[in-house]
């Protein structure tokens, strides 16, 4: 992909810099400002959700500690999950989308800039509403991040209504963000940029946006049904009135399974840009990557009941969902094969983004293998609701989504800030995260297979050693992220000036503009040959 840029197009832009002061951020419609706000917001939520995880791991450091009340422990597990999923991972990827998609497709901005502003500002409101529940008399949500009825309806604390409204706000924000991404990608590509010339990050986000539009209304529906059951006398989820609590699980997981792919597909896209850049050769199998992404997105809609193997669904249903789930391993395997093939015989260097990307490939694959184990319906009776499940989804979410975000941050920080980050500190952040993360989550496979259940504040003595290991690893991983904050601030404030293209093998339009990226870019669209 080569870009020819009209040098004269940038002449008149210098007059239109950002406004000054606080109102610049409150009222901005600039995709770079909004992307920056999403990224900072998601990092703050990452630290908050992480601090909740530290409470969980402190309680589980030894059996019998009782640092916090069991009721509060359950609020921590619930809030940790909700904040990490809806507050950390998803807004981080939306921030990357806002910053990078216009730069990658040669667009002057997002298609719907004012809606962009609104979809961001809904989020602080939503999370203030959610976190405020912790200070209410009956405490915050205590029913797990999957909020199964009747725990979340009949037996819920009074604050559940705030939780429901917070979910509604997040969902509205996600839908608007997704509409914006689709409108931008389908309408604002530079001349010559066909769909099959787009960077894979753009492709994965296009497909993710369709997933969001499809499933966020389902989440809104299920929490609205909860609201009706709690306050308006319906019995959607109450057998006494002719409803069924299992209906909740079906509706929730019909949202929930595509949701986990919403959290990983953008990471697939980012890694598909980063690995070729540091291998100094084009991505292997571009077309198959696009089709694999589409296949994953399609299959994500027909696997939801694998979360429900032990609830009592007909065996023929279990059989279907088992095979459908295993089928997702095929397009995912295509992707892993292509990433490894891209590195094959490349001129590799191991800067921080590449380290995170390689760790992503290896550890995400481990998480995928434990997922295949969980997909086996008869075996799942042993794994279900144990720490093995916790190990599985943290191996896909931490080295998957979170490492994908770290890799992207290090990869694009020079473009955002105009400075190179400190490579030595970046590598240190990587290795501490890598060791801490594996130390925290690998032992969970063992205690899970030995029968330790999830969501408990105390446990049998036989699980003590591995839990202490997990806690030490988790504290190490958590503390390291404060160090990451230091690296980013240091990079913003100074460092070696970044060239327009700081990475040798990087491809794409975003490297044709100066670093830091000007406030307005591609006012005249570039020509893509």
Residue ranges and their predicted role:
Residues 2-529:
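Membrane-embedded and interfacial regions of multi-pass energy-transducing membrane proteins
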């Amino acid at each position: 992909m080569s870009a020819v840029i009209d040098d004269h197009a940038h002449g008149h832009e210098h007059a239109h810099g950002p406004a000054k002061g606080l109102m610049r951020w409150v009222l901005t419609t600039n995709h770079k400002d909004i992307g920056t706000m999403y990224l900072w917001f998601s990092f703050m939520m990452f630290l908050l959700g992480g601090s909740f995880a530290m409470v969980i791991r402190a309680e589980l450091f030894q059996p019998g500690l009782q640092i916090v009340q069991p009721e509060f422990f359950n609020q921590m597990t619930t809030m940790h999950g909700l904040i990490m999923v809806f507050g950390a991972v998803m807004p981080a990827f939306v921030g990357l989308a806002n910053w990078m998609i216009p730069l990658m497709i040669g667009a002057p901005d997002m298609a719907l800039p004012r809606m962009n502003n609104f979809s961001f500002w809904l989020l602080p409101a939503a999370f203030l509403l959610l976190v405020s529940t912790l200070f209410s008399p009956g405490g915050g949500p205590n029913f797990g991040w999957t909020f199964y009825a009747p725990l979340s309806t009949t037996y819920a604390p009074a604050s559940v209504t705030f939780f429901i409204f917070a979910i509604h706000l997040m969902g509205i924000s996600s839908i608007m963000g997704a509409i914006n991404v689709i409108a931008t990608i389908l309408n604002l590509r530079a001349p010559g940029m066909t769909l099959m010339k787009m960077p894979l990050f753009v492709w994965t986000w296009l497909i993710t946006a369709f997933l969001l539009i499809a499933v966020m209304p389902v989440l809104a529906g299920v929490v609205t049904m909860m609201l009706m059951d709690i306050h308006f006398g319906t019995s959607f989820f109450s057998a006494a009135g002719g409803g069924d609590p299992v209906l909740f699980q079906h509706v929730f997981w019909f949202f929930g399974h595509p949701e986990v792919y919403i959290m990983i597909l953008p990471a697939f896209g980012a890694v598909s840009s980063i690995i070729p850049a540091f291998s100094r050769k084009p991505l292997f199998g571009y077309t198959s990557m696009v089709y694999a992404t589409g296949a994953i997105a399609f299959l994500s809609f027909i696997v939801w009941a694998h979360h429900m193997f032990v609830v009592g669904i007909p065996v023929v249903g279990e059989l279907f969902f088992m095979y459908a789930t295993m089928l997702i391993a095929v397009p995912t395997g295509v992707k892993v094969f292509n990433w490894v093939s891209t590195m094959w015989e490349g001129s590799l260097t191991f800067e921080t983004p590449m380290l995170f990307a390689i760790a992503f490939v290896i550890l995400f694959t481990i998480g995928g293998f434990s997922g295949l184990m969980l997909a086996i319906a008869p075996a799942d009776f042993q794994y279900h609701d144990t720490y093995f499940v916790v190990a599985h989804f943290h191996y896909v979410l931490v080295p998957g989504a979170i490492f994908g975000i770290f890799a992207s941050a290090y990869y694009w920080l020079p473009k955002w800030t105009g400075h190179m980050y400190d490579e030595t500190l970046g590598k240190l952040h990587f290795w501490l995260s890598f060791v801490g993360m594996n130390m925290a989550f690998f032992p969970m496979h063992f205690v899970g297979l030995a029968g330790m259940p999830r969501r408990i504040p105390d446990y049998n003595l036989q699980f003590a050693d591995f839990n202490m290991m997990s806690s030490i690893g988790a504290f190490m991983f958590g503390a390291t992220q404060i160090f990451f904050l230091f690296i980013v601030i240091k990079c913003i404030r100074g460092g070696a000036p970044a060239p327009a293209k700081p990475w040798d093998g990087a491809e794409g339009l975003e490297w044709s503009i100066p670093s830091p990226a000007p406030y307005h870019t591609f006012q005249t669209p570039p020509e893509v040959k």
